[in-house]
Structures are given as C-alpha cells and as structure tokens.
C-alpha cells in the first residue's frame, strides 16, 4: 500500500510540475507578444504618416528659407537702388520719407501721395502706372529721347506768363510702364518755371514704390528723361539771364 501511495503522490507532483511549467511558458509568450504590439502602437502614434510627415517638414522648412531669402534679396535690391539713384541723379542723396525734402511741384506731390495711399502691392502699382500712360497723347518720331529700353518722346514748349518763363511738357513712349512714367514727369513738371523744375530731387520716385518693380534699364531711362528736362530748364534760365 505504501508503494502505491508513493507512486500516486509522485505522479501527482509530476503533473503539477508539468502543468506549472506549461503555464509559465505560455505566460511568458503572452507577455512578449503583447510587448511587441505595444511597441508597434507606440511607433505608429509617434509617426502615423511615415515618410510623408518628414517630407512635409522639409517642405515647410524650404518654403521658410525661400521666404527669408526673398526678404534678404529685397533688402539688398533696395540698398542697390539707393546707391544707383545717388550715383546717377547728380549726387542728390535719398532723404527721409518727408515729402518736403524733395522740393516737389504740387502736381508731383499729388502723384506721390496717390501712390503712397495704394496698398504695398507692386502689381497694383504697376497697373496704375500703365493706366496713367494712357493719358499721353501721340507724338512725332523726331522728338524721341534715347537712353531708355523703350522709345521715348519728350518735348518742351516755353510760354511767357507775367514776365516769367513757364515750361510745358508733352511725352509718349511705346512701352507700357515707361509711358506711365513719362506721363508722371511731363504732367508733374508742366506749368512751372525752370527754377522750380531744377529743385526737384529725382529720387522722389522711390517714395511712390514704383522703383521697386522697375528694371535697371528703365531706371536709367527715367533718370535720362529727368536729366534732359533739367538740362532744358537750365538752358532756359541761362538764356533768360543774358
């Protein structure tokens, strides 16, 4: 009897040990599997879009860089324009935004204030310049002024008003933007004596914002027209003094 009981007890212990080992191994497998799932979930939450998320970040970064680059380039362009105007306009430097410092005629002052009241949008301002150019009457070809990207016509006439010489200007051009600039000058400087025309600082164009979208050739053409108008005004003054 004792031997049989001992065998039964041994078998029972063996069954318990086997069952316990099976349970332990299964529990370990379950924990390992659940841990992998947890890791996968964490990875998916951290980067749900995979590579697309990285691409979006790099794209926004590149756009930000381009925007900053444009701002830096615009600053350099403004500095270059100031130096160019200072060099080509007879050493008349740019001053503050105070309009009084430019000795403008009443017509030019009105034009500057008109463009300053517009939104700071180069396209909008360029369209306004083109619209002003439509007011220029046609002119004969023999009156053209060279030195600009487009063919330009500028012609003065002198009138005597109460013993004073008054200059009137007409102008035209085959370029849309240049034609508008010609109109600004001939309209703004017509009806005034040569002394008043000579006092006008040609850098006033920077107050309007027009110079921001002009090419270098058009800027040179603008200053060439101003130089011709001032040269004629000087000759009128010299002839009047003789």
Swiss-Prot record:
Cellular component terms (Gene Ontology): apicoplast
Family of the protein in this entry: Belongs to the SufE family.
InterPro entries: Fe-S_metab-assoc_dom
Organism superkingdom: Eukaryota
Function description: Participates in sulfur mobilization (SUF) pathway for iron-sulfur (Fe-S) cluster biogenesis. Enhances cysteine desulfurase activity of SufS. Probably functions as a sulfur acceptor for SufS.
Upper taxonomic lineage: Eukaryota, Sar, Alveolata, Apicomplexa, Aconoidasida
Gene3D superfamilies reported for this sequence: 3.90.1010.10
Compartments where located: Plastid, Apicoplast
Catalytic residues as annotated in Swiss-Prot or TrEMBL: 148 (cysteine persulfide intermediate)
Subunit structure: Monomer. Interacts with SufS; interaction enhances cysteine desulfurase activity of SufS.
Pfam families: SufE
Pathway of action: Cofactor biosynthesis; iron-sulfur cluster biosynthesis
Gene this protein is translated from: SufE
Main location: plastid
Keywords for this protein: Apicoplast, Plastid
Record-given protein name: Cysteine desulfuration protein SufE
């Amino acid at each position: 009897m004792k031997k049989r009981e001992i065998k039964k007890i041994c078998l029972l212990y063996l069954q318990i040990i086997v069952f316990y080992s099976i349970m332990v191994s299964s529990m370990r497998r379950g924990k390992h599997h659940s841990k992998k799932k947890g890791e996968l979930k964490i990875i998916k939450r951290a980067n749900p879009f995979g590579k697309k998320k990285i691409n979006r970040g790099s794209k926004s970064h590149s756009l930000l860089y381009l925007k900053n680059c444009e701002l830096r380039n615009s600053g350099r362009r403004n500095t270059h324009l100031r130096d160019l105007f200072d060099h080509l306009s007879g050493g008349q430097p740019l001053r503050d935004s105070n309009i009084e410092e430019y000795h403008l005629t009443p017509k030019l002052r009105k034009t500057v204030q008109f463009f300053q009241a517009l939104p700071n949008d180069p396209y909008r301002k360029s369209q306004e310049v083109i619209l002003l150019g439509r007011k220029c009457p046609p002119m004969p070809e023999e009156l053209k002024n060279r030195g600009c990207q487009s063919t330009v016509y500028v012609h003065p006439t002198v009138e005597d008003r109460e013993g004073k010489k008054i200059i009137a200007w007409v102008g035209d051009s085959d370029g849309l933007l240049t034609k508008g600039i010609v109109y600004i000058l001939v309209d703004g400087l017509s009806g005034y004596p040569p002394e008043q025309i000579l006092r006008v600082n040609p850098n006033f164009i920077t107050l309007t914002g027009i110079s921001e979208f002009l090419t270098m050739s058009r800027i040179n053409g603008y200053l060439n027209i101003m130089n011709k108008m001032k040269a004629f005004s000087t000759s009128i003054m010299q002839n009047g003094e003789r």
